[in-house]
C-alpha cells in the first residue's frame, strides 16, 4: 500500500556526484537508480527532475563575468547530461525510461509535451524532465513544482544529499538547530528556511502540492517516503 501514486522526484546534481562533488559517480547513480526501481515496482508513477550543479554552477559563470541568462542555459544543458546518465542506469536495470527536454534536442530526447508525459506515466514508464523550465532565471526546484502541477502529481520528493530534513538552522554549524517534522509552504517562506526558492514554494502552495524533504543517501528512503513512513520533513501544500 502506497501513500503517493504519482510523484515528482527532485534529485540535485550534487547528489549524483557523491563525495567527489563534481561529475557523475557511477556507483552513486547506480544506487539511486536501484532505489527508483524499488518504487517503480510498487506501481508508483515516477517523474524525475534533475539538477545540474555537479557539472555547472551559476557562481562559476558569475566569476567569469558571464551574463546570467547565458550561464542559466549552460545549467540547463548540464541537467540534460544528468538525465541521460540516469536514463541509461534505469534502463540497464530494466526500468523503461523517457527523457523529455524543455529545449528541443530531438536526436537525444523527446521535447516536453505534457499529455505525452502523462501517457508515459500511465504506461508505467519513468519520465525524466530535463532542461529546467527552458527559461533562464528559473531554478530546477521551480521546474519540479511546475511539472508537478502540470502532471497532477501527489507530492514532490526533495531528495537531498546527506540532509535528513528541514532544520531551523544549519545543524552542521548550530548545535541548537531543531529539525521540523512538518511545516507549510508559508512557514518556509516566512521563516526563510531555504528549502527551495520562493518561486517554487509559492507555486507549490498555490497548487496545493505537498513536499517531503529527506536524505537520499540512506538506502530505501525513497520507498519509505512513498509508503508513508515518517522520515524527513513533510511540507503541506495548504498554508
From Swiss-Prot:
- Tell me one GO molecular function of this protein: ATP binding
Reaction catalysed by this enzyme: UMP + ATP = UDP + ADP
Query: What's the top EC group for this one?
Result: transferase
In this chain, the stretch annotated as Involved in allosteric activation by GTP covers 18-23
Entry keyword annotation includes Transferase: yes
Cite the SUPFAM superfamilies for this sequence: Carbamate kinase-like (SSF53633)
| Keyword match rRNA-binding | no
Task: Give the GO cellular component terms, alphabetically.
Answer: cytoplasm
**Where does this protein reside within or beyond the cell?**
Cytoplasm
Which pathway is it part of? Pyrimidine metabolism; CTP biosynthesis via de novo pathway; UDP from UMP (UMPK route): step 1/1
What residues form the membrane-spanning segments? none
Q: Which CDD domains match?
A: AAK_UMPK-PyrH-Ec
What InterPro entries does UniProt report for this protein, alphabetically?
AceGlu_kinase-like_sf, Asp/Glu/Uridylate_kinase, Uridylate_kinase, Uridylate_kinase_bac
For this chain, the family text in UniProt reads: Belongs to the UMP kinase family.
NCBIfam families annotated for this entry? Answer: pyrH_bact
Q: How does it assemble?
A: Homohexamer.
Q: What is the name attached to this protein's record?
A: Uridylate kinase
Species of origin:
Lacticaseibacillus paracasei (strain ATCC 334 / BCRC 17002 / CCUG 31169 / CIP 107868 / KCTC 3260 / NRRL B-441) (Lactobacillus paracasei)
Amino acid at each position: 500500500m502506497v501513500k503517493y501514486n504519482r510523484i515528482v522526484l527532485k534529485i540535485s546534481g550534487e547528489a549524483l556526484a557523491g563525495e567527489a562533488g563534481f561529475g557523475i559517480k557511477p556507483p552513486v547513480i547506480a544506487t539511486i537508480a536501484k532505489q527508483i526501481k524499488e518504487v517503480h515496482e510498487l506501481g508508483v508513477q515516477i517523474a524525475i527532475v534533475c539538477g545540474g550543479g555537479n557539472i555547472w554552477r551559476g557562481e562559476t559563470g558569475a566569476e567569469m563575468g558571464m551574463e546570467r541568462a547565458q550561464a542559466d542555459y549552460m545549467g540547463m544543458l548540464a541537467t540534460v547530461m544528468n538525465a541521460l546518465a540516469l536514463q541509461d542506469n534505469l534502463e540497464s536495470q530494466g526500468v523503461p525510461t523517457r527523457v523529455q527536454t524543455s529545449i528541443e534536442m530531438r536526436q537525444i530526447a523527446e521535447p516536453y509535451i505534457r499529455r505525452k508525459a502523462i501517457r508515459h506515466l500511465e504506461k508505467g514508464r519513468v519520465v525524466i524532465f530535463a532542461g529546467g523550465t527552458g527559461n533562464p532565471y528559473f531554478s530546477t526546484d521551480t521546474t519540479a513544482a511546475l511539472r508537478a502541477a502540470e502532471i497532477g502529481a501527489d507530492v514532490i520528493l526533495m531528495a537531498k544529499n546527506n540532509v535528513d530534513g528541514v532544520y531551523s538552522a544549519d545543524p552542521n554549524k548550530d548545535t541548537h538547530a531543531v529539525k521540523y517534522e512538518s511545516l507549510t509552504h508559508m512557514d518556509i517562506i516566512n521563516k526563510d528556511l531555504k528549502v527551495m526558492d520562493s518561486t517554487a514554494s509559492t507555486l507549490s502552495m498555490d497548487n496545493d502540492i505537498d513536499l517531503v524533504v529527506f536524505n537520499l543517501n540512506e538506502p530505501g528512503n525513497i520507498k519509505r517516503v512513498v509508503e508513508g513512513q515518517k522520515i524527513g520533513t513533510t511540507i503541506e501544500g495548504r498554508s
